[in-house]
Swiss-Prot record:
Residues 196-215 have a biased composition (Polar residues). This is Regulatory protein E2. It is found in: Host nucleus. The keyword DNA-binding applies. It comes from the Viruses. GO terms for biological process: DNA replication; DNA-templated transcription; regulation of DNA replication; viral DNA genome replication. Disulfide bonds: none annotated. Residues 404-488 are annotated as: DNA-binding domain. Pfam families: PPV_E2_C, PPV_E2_N. Residues 278-291, 301-311, 332-346 have a biased composition (Basic residues).
Amino acid sequence: MEALNARFNVLQEMLMDIYESGKEDLETQIEHWKLLRQEQALLFFARKHSIMRLGYQPVPPMAVSETKAKQAIGMMLTLQSLQKSPFGKEKWTLVNTSLETYNAPPAQCFKKGPYNIEVIFDGDPENLMVYTAWKEIYFVDSDDMWQKVQGEVDYAGAYYKDGTIKQYYVTFADDAVRYGTSGQYEVRINNETVFAPVTSSTPPSTGLRESSNASPVHDTVDETPTSTTATTTTFSTTTATATATGAPELSSKTGTRKGRYGRKDSSPTAASNSRKEVSRRRSRSRTRTRRREASTSRSQKASRSRSRSRSTSRGSRGSGGSVTTSRDSSPKRTRRGRGRGGRSRRSPTPTSTSKRERRRSRSRGGEPVSGGVGISPDKVGSRVQTVSGRHLGRLGRLLEEASDPPVILLRGDPNILKCYRYRDKKRKLGLVKHYSTTWSWVGVDGNERIGRSRMLLSFTSNSTRSQYVKIMKLPKGVEWSFGNFDKL
């Protein structure tokens, strides 16, 4: 313990020497990350051996120390690679080689010379966003060689060039759609308007969505001084509207370019009005024809059903002989009674009548009859979802609510219950649906806790709960019991 504290104090003193010296060489920055790695290794070792404090420094969890140690190793290797490049002799400060600067946009690059870019959306000075751009950017190309380029800004965003390809790390068009309504934005650097308002998003007439990585299109570029003292570069949007997708709006009918404030469609002529009137008349005539056909079919169906019911009733009354099915004197079709071996319609039996009555009662949404199917005892407590009250009677809802979710109630020391919950989750048995936090009962007259702490374990069915009880390994002093809830 004493040796560990002594080594930790030595590392702290060496780090303080680097901070106070303020050296700006790459060798010092590599040494700084090396000491940070050793510091995290000591903290990891201390926490592994249940040491919670080194001197005045609290020891973090092992996962935190492990993550920071890996980050320090990665930065140390990256700086060693940069040291072998032609840029290893330049000035490098602690800020330039910090992890935050390295991961800031553009990520995985070293940057120098930050400056701010102000973007105003919708022409509202209050709707302003500040971005950070960089003058010098160091990155590794596809050949694993370090390159140094100048950061640049245009109407689309901040970027740097990897060969001839622009690599944008800030895009204004995306935020123009997010923070603005009209899609216009204005770019300012050092309180000077560099780019005039640019329309970044308009609804395309074709209804198609294009690539969001393309840059806005402008047909003309005018460099004229504005009323202010700053010189502005104005990108005209009268001839082509730049969208958030970076393409001009196209007409859906002719396929030609159509400006945002372009000419509208011509007013309707007399010929077009007459064509519209003819189409209206045709649609009305079709509607009337459909209605007449529908009414005719309904009347025919009703007449057929009435004639069928009359013939059935007459056939059931006769015990034999021939029975005519039409009202006129000339018999057309006869049905033989049972006495002569012919066929006749069967009279409704009590079984079929009861089935029809049962179906009729169910269709009305009422309660099931006394002979309906209930719920078996082994199914009680098998439902987890809350029962809906729609389309259920009182008896139907009672049967549905009989399937309550089963639970197990644990009683014991709160810390022991928490440790058991943690270990049981690690086992990942897949039997427990939910674990509750530890809780306690309180009295009616005060807030004093009564008895030991409790914790609930819910299950999807009684079978899963039974399986869990067979393999359950409770700590000493923990009691358990079964239970059910109306809903969780």
